Amino acid sequence: MPGVVFDLDGTLVHSAPDIHAAVNKALAEEGGAPFTLAEITGFIGNGVPVLIQRVLAARGEAPDAHRQAELQGRFMAHYEADPATLTSVYPGAEAAIRHLRAEGWRIGLCTNKPVGASRQILSLFGLLELFDAIIGGESLPQRKPDPAPLRATAAALNEEVVLYVGDSEVDAATAEAAGLRFALFTEGYRHAPVHELPHHGLFSHHDELQDLLRRLLA
């Protein structure tokens, strides 16, 4: 059977609340004002370094490598210590992946989240065993939307990957650059209207994924 690759944040798990909490904990240590959940959700998608860059820019701080590294380190310490208290798996996501595996599909994960945190979250929800390959934000020099991470995930699966499943502009651009079909989960963290994102199919609940795959492969 061929392979299918998933994004993580905003596609399989609603992780923004824990990311939000970790950012605000790091800022509180220095007396910084908290961000709202909506603000932090808007910063998610391009990996931790860009998340912290956006936090600092929103605070009106000029770019500074030392400041970036310092805040990023404290954010990661808080996040890795407590990555899933407020996080939830999207309804139907686990069942959809288990069904795919039962049919013989190879399953990959391509995310801009660090591999350690990704594995930790998947393990806490009993999902880690379902993935045959995981590529994260530090696995390669490039991050999504560069196609290299998605291509590396596909290569690690040793199967023809027929679909990338994601939720955002970053994911759509990654699939397009890699020359793969893209299925858009509409309930994630995208900013643009659906019609502005290149996609081959879309779904609002993971229960719909099986039928979508069948239509795309017909």
From Swiss-Prot:
Gene Ontology CC annotations of this record: cytosol
Pathway(s) of this molecule: Organic acid metabolism; glycolate biosynthesis; glycolate from 2-phosphoglycolate: step 1/1
Entry's EC annotation: 3.1.3.18
Enzyme class: hydrolase
Gene Ontology MF annotations: metal ion binding; phosphoglycolate phosphatase activity
UniProt keyword annotation of Hydrolase present: yes
InterPro entries reported in the protein's UniProt record: HAD-like_hydrolase_sf, HAD-like_sf, HAD-SF_hydro_IA, HAD_sf, PGP-like_dom2, PGPase_prok
Pfam families in alphabetical order: Hydrolase (PF00702)
Residues that coordinate or bind Mg(2+): D7, D9, D167
GO biological process: carbohydrate metabolic process; DNA repair; glycolate biosynthetic process
Keyword check for Metal-binding: yes
Active site, UniProt feature: D7 (nucleophile)
Reaction equations catalysed: 2-phosphoglycolate + H2O = glycolate + phosphate
Cofactor: Mg(2+)
Keywords assigned: Carbohydrate metabolism, Hydrolase, Magnesium, Metal-binding
Sequence similarity: Belongs to the HAD-like hydrolase superfamily. CbbY/CbbZ/Gph/YieH family.
HAMAP family: GPH_hydrolase_bact
Role: Specifically catalyzes the dephosphorylation of 2-phosphoglycolate. Is involved in the dissimilation of the intracellular 2-phosphoglycolate formed during the DNA repair of 3'-phosphoglycolate ends, a major class of DNA lesions induced by oxidative stress.
PANTHER family per record: PHOSPHOGLYCOLATE PHOSPHATASE
Name of the protein in question: Phosphoglycolate phosphatase
Organism: Cereibacter sphaeroides
The gene coding this protein: cbbZ
